[in-house]
């Protein structure tokens, strides 16, 4: 017993010395004076928010979104920005690819007049800008598009064809060590968009890998794999893409959930269509034949007309969205069953979906 008391006194003295040297709060007991809830920002997709478990992307963390070309990576991040701006948050877009279309961003609901944008010349410059913005404590969301376009200064100044083995990986590794702590302190969400490459000589297993080395994989709290799985058609006209997102890593909730939704060209994620589907699944929206009803009132014949009704009555859509979020994100026990509404196994083939009721 005396030995235990001596240990407690020694521990208290050590904690006091640490706080005196490094400041109050530099060390604490995990359950003491802090919220265990993770603050999140919506992705713009209800089904993806459910699949993520915490209700969105976690603040103060690093997130990686990767996938093939034209799979919806930039669209998803622009939807995150739009959702954050609706909450009054400040966002920044680091356009390393020099390909951001402000007209398209505006169509997705982004307030381009209040969106900070940078088109850096080198990878080091892009990452220094990220660090400066996060240390300011005034920016809530930072998007980097993309890791593959973060070209080291030495490579830009060199000749085409010169070998620069491992330069990008070393640059990213150093940046991750520096950024991780600053992001946590400022509660800033940093999202990296990444591209896919093929590993040469892989006979077994997945030959796909992402650019920028392994540091980002380790430091990311959430990694999302986004794929286009088919086309959304209105008659013979292709009006969008069927999209599947898999949560391949998740440090704030259970990983390996999947979400499926539609991305409509010029409009973004079909959020109202998601509300209809989830509402029917959880018996908040009644479906009798082709007719959809909500609170006893018919809202449309066919999914397309029901979606139009919600678009014309935003207060009804907001009410249904709140009910679904309260039900499906009430506790962690609901995450698995809720995400399963949109869970399917990955398929290598890409289908065309003739969906006239988009």
Curated annotation (Swiss-Prot):
Gene3D superfamilies found in the cross-reference section: P-loop containing nucleotide triphosphate hydrolases (3.40.50.300)
Top-level lineage group: Bacteria
Compartments (UniProt record): Cytoplasm
InterPro entries associated with the record: AAA+_ATPase, DNA_recomb/repair_RecA, DNA_recomb/repair_RecA_CS, P-loop_NTPase, RecA-like_C, RecA-like_N, RecA_ATP-bd, RecA_C_sf
Assigned protein family: Belongs to the RecA family.
Function field: Can catalyze the hydrolysis of ATP in the presence of single-stranded DNA, the ATP-dependent uptake of single-stranded DNA by duplex DNA, and the ATP-dependent hybridization of homologous single-stranded DNAs. It interacts with LexA causing its activation and leading to its autocatalytic cleavage.
Protein's name in the database: Protein RecA
The species this protein was found in: Xenorhabdus nematophila (strain ATCC 19061 / DSM 3370 / CCUG 14189 / LMG 1036 / NCIMB 9965 / AN6)
